[in-house]
């Protein structure tokens, strides 16, 4: 296994504060452990924003105090997210009305 992963899966989520505690319990005790059992997933770690968030769109900067959660998974290959195990594990459907998310696989640029 090389020092650097072949690719990354980045999951960024904003959670409605009304379900944030429930979301965190579920993510930490069910979702993340299940994800780490999937073939091709080396490891993963969750992060949460600290302090004010600054976003710039079309030259306009906005600041916000909302929390953003980011999970970084190291994958053996981009197809790791297409396995049956990964597709079964994905489901956070019961939280769908309460989250805004972005998921993307990142591969080496060069």
Would you name each region that the model predicts?
Residues 1-110:
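Macromolecular interaction modules
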